[in-house]
Structure formats: structure tokens, C-alpha cells
Amino acid sequence: MSRISRRAYADMFGPTVGDRVRLADTALWVEVEKDFTVYGEEVKFGGGKVIRDGMGQGQMLAAQAMDLVLTNALIIDHWGIVKADIGVKHGRIAAIGKAGNPDVQPGVTVPVGPGTEVIAAEGKIVTAGGIDSHIHFICPQQVEEALTSGVTTFIGGGTGPATGTNATTCTPGPWYLARMLQAADSLPINIGLLGKGNASRPEALREQIAAGAVGLKLHEDWGSTPAAIDCCLSVAEEMDIQVAIHTDTLNESGCIEDTLAAIGDRTIHTFHTEGAGGGHAPDIIRAAGQANVLPSSTNPTLPYTVNTVDEHLDMLMVCHHLDPSIAEDVAFAESRIRRETIAAEDILHDMGAFAMTSSDSQAMGRVGEVVLRTWQVAHQMKVRRGPLAPDSSYSDNFRVKRYIAKYTLNPALTHGIAHEVGSVEVGKLADLVLWSPAFFAVKPALVIKGGMIVTAPMGDINGSIPTPQPVHYRPMFGALGAARHATRMTFLPQAAMDRGLAQELGLQSLIGVAHGCRRVRKADMVHNTLQPVIEVDSQTYQVRADGELLVCEPASELPLAQRYFLF
């Protein structure tokens, strides 16, 4: 039997079982747990390579073969870190295993035929497209920025740069919901809209859900009173949609105890649960320990650095329509920004108490930095806290699975769309992101949306090859024309489907039905199930989880930062 060195094999076909890969310039390493390919029968495209007629490519018709195969990919997902070929059919993941020609090769589960396109993923990492569950739809250009960061799904609300949208993630009322659903139909990203949940009577909430709101948002700027919370959750239970909440920073209508009492044992998604983005001062962070609370962070506080506190005051004044000449407005802003709770947030993420990350796009958050900042937190916690059990000093597989779930599967579960998106699993939309390991979490090599490349770095269009400078991200064919409709999905509640809303509005995109989110609990948050008793000292703002003081020095230097953005 012929043999080659591990190094030569990895250079040719990518890493295999036992090999380690460093994630960009972080302190994080992953180890390949399983290899689905067959040694000696690997497929690779190119001159003199395997995927040729009668060799790695068979004679089957399109119905029996894949539309697209990603060869020799290193998949990083909540369920594993494995080497495999990925097959895509009709825009969905159809197989994960061994690609090739079953007529002449053993173990083939991903058949390649004359109708099959190939993307070479040797030496590349493949992850699921990210889900940003805290989007202010302030401008449509957010979509391009998000796609080039590896995010392929938006959940949020808004109508453009209106004052209400600048502050709150709500698309209020049936008319605006209809117009935003029609606008979203032309955007090459999956979208679900949140209606305004602040009402003390149910009728106006029911009509928003019937008009297409996949969830409702309670926001203090509209009045997150106990009555509004109870009414909103009652309608959500009745109509099977999720509720997201930004609680009462000023504690005017009640403190955290009153909010938790109004919520009861009903499931709710708490936004920026640390509190700098808004919420009961100083102890909204306590909510992260509740069994029915699905807690997320927004990215301005992630990770805690020497600059975090200083930038927050101005952000807050702008986004929430505050006046720096009014002392009460300044006091309101300052009450939300606490070094101690911001520092504790990183640690609670590492412990698995905070389950999700998101952006808060253009409203105290950066839409293109959800993926990047999630991994900066993971790095910082590795440096500060060491390996995370059951990891060893050799690899960080469990920590990596915990963190990737925060912006993929867990927000999908939270909003009832995990049957369509959120992981690299058979049957789901082929929303896939390819990364060169050196650029992981910073600059994708390709972004695939519903089976088509939607954006990619591309060189000089008049070049003789695709790679000459200047290279920058450009929209690809998956983002154009009717291909957008065949590769993107609009999420609607069952109530909207029952009335034929998609047909009524003339929507041409794929339609996904959000459902089952009322049954989701903290225990269902993959790799992020911890429910500690969290205490906050009202004078010092020190945070304890199950009695342990959570203290973390701010970072003065981070990976995934300046060295990647010089040009």
C-alpha cells in the first residue's frame, strides 16, 4: 500500500482524523473527530484529478446525482467537527458523506454525475450561515454587510431610518408588515419580521401576526409594562410565535422581579441580557438564570475591552433619541453602562448561561461583526480561563461547538425556524459559509445561499483569471434576478399562512413556517443550557453566579482585528 505523510495528505485533501487546525489568529484549535471520506478514494476536481467522466463522475441522470458537491470540507457545527463531502440538491443539503461515482468507488453516499457542480473545499472550513436575531431594519445595505460576514438569516423589525426603528426592532401594524415583506422579497437573505408587542389588549397583536409577524417585540421605548408583557405573551401562546423583550431600564413600571412575575413560566427571548443595550438597571442579567428565559447578547459589549465603556454613551444617546442637554436623559444612559456586568457577560457566555449572540444592527450594534465578536469572546475566555471541560490543552472542540451554536442553531430554535436553517444537516437550506482557516470568522472565502454562491471575494473583472487585485466582495448570481427568490426564504407564522398572505402580497420567495417556539426552554439551547442563580450587588454591581464572583479584566488586544483590515 502506498503511503504519504500527514502533511502531504492535508495539503492535498485537507486535514483528517487527529489533525488540528488553528482558527485564524485566535488561541482556539479544533481537532478532526471523524473523516467520512475513504482513504485512497478521495474525490478532487481539476486537471488530472479524480472527478472526471468514468472515474469520480458517474453516468447517472440529474435526478440521481447532486446539483453541487463541496469536496473534502472540514465541517464545524454544533454536532461535530468532521471531514466530509457535502451534497446539495434543489438548494438544500441532501447528503453529508463520501462523494464520487458509485459504479467504480466504494462507500459513495454523495453521487456525482454530469449535472453536478463542484466547489473545492479542501483545506477549507464549512459552517452554517449565521442567524442574527436582533436586526433593526434601518437600511437594506445591511444585507450585503451581513452576507460578507457569514450571516444568512435576519430576524428583526423596522421600516427604514425612522425614529422608532432606530431605537426598536418593530415593524408595527399590518400596512408596514406588508410593505416590508414585499421589500424583503428582493433581498438575498432569509428574513422574519417582528411586530410591535407593546399593547395591553390582544386585538392589535393578533392582527400583526396574521399580517406576517413571525414574532413580537416588547421594547421599553414603547412601554414594557407588566400589563403589556402579560398580554403579549398570552397572544404568543395562543398563536405560536416568539416574544423578544427589551425591559424597563428605569424600573418605572416595575423592577426585574415584576417583569419575571409578568412573564411567569412562559418562554421569552431576552435581548442584550447584560443590560448595556437596555433593561432593568442594574440587574437584568439575573434573567439569564431562568429556565424559561432564552438570553442573548448584542455585540457592542462583546468582548469586554478597554474601549467598551467609552463608546457606549454616545451610541446610546443617538439610538434612543436622548438629549445630552437634559440631565435625566444623561442619567438614563449612564445607568445602563456598568463595567462589572459587561465583564460578567463574557464569563456567562463561556459557562453556557448566555445562549445567543446577535448584532443590534445600527442601533448600538454592528451588523457585520456577530461572527467575529463571538469568536473574540471564545478566544478571550480561553486565554483567561483555560481549556473548557471536557477539552484539553490539545484542542478546543467543545468550546468551539458551544460558541458556534450561539449564532446558528440556538437562535433558529428560539424563533421556530430550526427545521429550515441553523446547522449543516441534511434537509436544511444549503446556507453554507466557506472559510480559509487563516481568515476564519473574519472574511469568508465563499457564501452559499440556498445552494448558489451569493457573495464572494472577486478580483479584477478584466483580469485573465479571477484573482488579480483589487479583490473585494461582490454580489454573485445567487443575489440576482429570480434566483434570489429560489434561494432565499421569508418566514411567516401559521396564522399568516392560513389566510394565504404570501399569495395576497405576491411574494415569490420560498416560504418557511415558524412554529414550535413556545415549547423551547433554556434546556433546549444546544451546549448553552446552564441556569445559575445570578446575583447583582445593587451598590457595586458585582455579579455572582451560584456564589462565584465573575471578574474579568478588559482586553487591550484581540485577535481577528486590525491585521485583517489593513486593506
Swiss-Prot record:
InterPro entries: Amidohydro-rel, Metal-dep_hydrolase_composite, Metal_Hydrolase, Urease_alpha_N_dom, Urease_alpha_subunit, Urease_AS, Urease_asu, Urease_asu_c. One of its GO terms (molecular function) is nickel cation binding. It comes from Pseudomonas putida (strain W619). Its main location: cytoplasm. GO terms for biological process: urea catabolic process. PROSITE patterns: UREASE_1 (PS01120), UREASE_2 (PS00145), UREASE_3 (PS51368). Binds 2 nickel ions per subunit. Ni(2+) 1 binds at residues 134, 136, 217, 360. Pathway: Nitrogen metabolism; urea degradation; CO(2) and NH(3) from urea (urease route): step 1/1. This is Urease subunit alpha. Substrate binds at residue 219. It is found in: Cytoplasm. Carboxylation allows a single lysine to coordinate two nickel ions. Ni(2+) 2 binds at residues 217, 246, 272. GO terms for cellular component: cytoplasm.
